[in-house]
Amino acid sequence: MKRQYKNTKKEFLGACFLGIVALFSLTIWHVINRTSKNKSYKVFVEFDSAYGIQEGTSVRLRGLPIGKVVGISQSSHSILTRIEIQSCNTIIPKTSLIETNQTGLLNDTIIDIVPFTTLNQEYHSLKEGPLSKTCDSNQIICHLNYLQGERGLNYDDLIRATTRISQRFDDPELFYGLYYLIGNMLKLSSNLVDCTEYMASISHFLGYK
């Protein structure tokens, strides 16, 4: 009886030990897998001007946030930004438009990435990811790639254009030119009305005859 009890106890302890080892292994695998999925990568994007970009500026892909600006350096002719993409699973085609835009009531600056092409799932670089040593920068944007950004929608340009238009309307020469044109159009329309009435009276007279 005692021997049977000891055997049962050993089997129970062995099962508990195996369960603990399995649970520990599963936890380690989950942590490693999660860490690898969330591993970020960085790219450099050059702009002609800052356009309101600062550290923390949001980076979006097709309208969804995927990263942020983590560094800015200035040269004599351009601004170089260092962008961190939050997950290495975010694959960006190399043929993409990178531009600054302003949004919201406060005109917050964001960086939009708009892909021009759709990636083939069979691409080797797509399977390996941007952090791979064999990443093909001709297909996708790889870790530490150097890219050129452009200027997109900017409310300062809109305000400047509106100001120029208002200044044009304040120009006396333009005002008198429009006044003269409107006067001639009114005279022409009056003459057309008189001509139409005259033709109508002639037609009525001929019909009466």
From Swiss-Prot:
Record flagged with keyword Chloroplast: yes
Statement: the UniProt record of this protein carries the keyword Lipid metabolism: no
Xref: InterPro entries: Mce/MlaD, TGD2-like
Pfam families noted in UniProt: MlaD (PF02470)
Cellular component terms (Gene Ontology): chloroplast inner membrane
Location(s), subcellular: Plastid, Chloroplast
UniProt keyword annotations, A-Z: Chloroplast, Plastid
A Gene Ontology molecular function term of the record: phospholipid binding
UniProt-recorded name of the protein: Uncharacterized protein ycf22
Provenance organism: Porphyra purpurea (Red seaweed)
UniProt superkingdom: Eukaryota
PANTHER family in the record: PROTEIN TRIGALACTOSYLDIACYLGLYCEROL 2, CHLOROPLASTIC
